[in-house]
Amino acid sequence: MTDPSLNGILGLMQLTDSALPTGAFSHSLGFETYMHAEQLEDQESFSAWLEMFVDQQLTYTDALAVRLVYAATDFERIEDLDDLVTAQALPRQVREGGMTMGKRLLSIGARSYPGDWVLRYQQGVDEERMHGHQATVWGVLARGLDVSEDTAVAAHVYATVISLTQNAVRGIPLGQNTGQAVIRAAQEWVGRAVATSRRLSEEGIAEEVLGAGAPGLEIAQMNHERQRARLFMS
């Protein structure tokens, strides 16, 4: 018999694997705008951008969203969070990308790990009553897998870091070994995202500061819509 905790970890590894067909390979979440402006050209410049992205946007959006899902006491709260988390993503490409990847993640998760909330979420998306934002979808799936809140936050942030780094490897381009060096360095930033989001949650202000990202990054993400030539959808 497999240890239940091991089942949860294995499920987490499946659903956060970069090979999962969610379409993450087609999103830069704004770094292509900086790349087009010749501000991202090597390991040092991409690492600086990625650290800023984790510290100033991902921590205050997806990390907090996962924690708010864990704090929910009924599914009606999940419906509210799905609206809130989707609405706070101001750049259109980022908002639509979050929904597209979230719906694919939910579809896979509903077939592989069909818990009550997961199936209700899928029904809500199918009936176009819910958006299926990736962060709230992941929070619901992680709760169903019975992994700890900190682990769920870390897994989602780290999976995003890996996807973006893999995209930078082929987009900038960077070497494969360089990409691995960036991912190793990013583990510290993931730890900060976990700690900061935990503190904000414990202080009871997670919902209040949700979406409090860096305006410059959001503007760059918006400008991406009007770039002449694009490798990525966001």
Explain the meaning of each model-derived region.
Residues 136, 147-155, 162:
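Amphipathic alpha-helical hairpins/coiled-coils and adjacent low-complexity
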Residues 52, 124, 154-159:
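Alpha-helical transmembrane segments of multi-pass membrane proteins, especially transporters
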Residues 12-75:
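Glycine/small-residue-rich interface belts in oligomeric ring/scaffold proteins
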Residues 39, 43-44, 155-234:
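C-terminal auxiliary extensions adjacent to catalytic cores
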Residues 5, 19-22, 58, 94-97, ...:
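Secondary-structure capping and boundary motifs in well-ordered enzyme cores
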Residues 63, 68, 75-146:
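Internal, conserved structured core segments that host functional sites
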Residues 1-10:
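Charged, compositionally biased N-terminal leader segments and the immediate start
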